[in-house]
Regions:
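Extended, low-polarity transmembrane helix blocks
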Residues: 2-96, 107-230
Length: 230
């Protein structure tokens, strides 16, 4: 028993055989959740109603980079002549799409649809900013690769609404649903506890509550006053 675990660990790393299905499923689930958190970090600075157009900041600034530093000239032409003249509707569309993406990925709902949307968004962002100063084009290639994996590989076997939907086809979905709801209950309870602790001493209905997350890694889970935490 004492040698089995190290041997299995070595086999997992060095064996040419595929990893166990469970390990692969868990790894893909982690990749899906990380992708969801990535999109969640993209949402907070897309601020309506003008999305930075008046001050030439925010989404307007990053969108205009497609014109200032073209990656694919036909795309830059579309941005200049179609997107920028209709920027407010475009901003709302981006906000809706990039709010929907993390919701679908983090909850594991319609993951393949989310992956397709993620591929489209990754392409659009990459063609807008990949040639801008201080940008790293390979970051957008990795975003495309991540969503391609999520499209083609089973990344919704665990911690996913899609797993409940799949269980309905093969049998009883209740155990899978209970595990999913229990996991989300624990996560939401932890967020509520953190928000309540950070809001101690604030007014119950403070207009802007304390943020929950880790700013150095651009991980934001929302702002909560004491009432919202409760």
């Amino acid at each position: 028993m004492t040698t089995a675990s190290p041997r299995r660990a070595l086999d997992l790393v060095f064996s040419p055989a595929p990893p166990p299905a469970r390990a692969g499923g868990i790894g893909l689930t982690v990749l899906r959740i990380v992708a969801g958190l990535l999109w969640l970090a993209h949402v907070w600075w897309k601020v309506p109603p003008d999305f930075g157009e008046a001050r030439r900041t925010g989404l307007w600034f990053w969108t205009h980079l497609a014109v200032d530093h073209p990656v694919f000239p036909p795309y830059s032409w579309l941005v200049e002549h179609l997107v920028l003249p209709n920027f407010t509707p475009f901003g709302w569309l981006v906000l809706v799409v990039e709010t929907l993406l993390p919701v679908l990925l983090l909850t594991g709902t319609a993951v393949r649809l989310a992956a397709l949307i993620g591929i489209g968004q990754s392409l659009a962002i990459g063609m807008s900013v990949a040639q801008a100063p201080n940008e790293w084009p390979w970051a957008y290639a990795m975003m495309l690769g991540i969503h391609l994996v999520l499209l083609l590989a089973p990344s919704a076997q665990y911690a996913a609404v899609d797993a409940v939907r799949a269980a309905r086809i093969g049998g009883d979905p209740a155990p899978v649903a209970r595990r999913l709801l229990g996991g989300w209950g624990v996560i939401l309870a932890l967020i509520a506890i953190l928000a309540a602790v950070k809001s101690l001493g604030d007014e119950l209905l403070a207009p802007r509550g304390s943020g929950v997350g880790y700013p150095p890694l651009q991980l934001f889970l929302g702002d909560y006053n004491m009432l919202a935490a409760m």
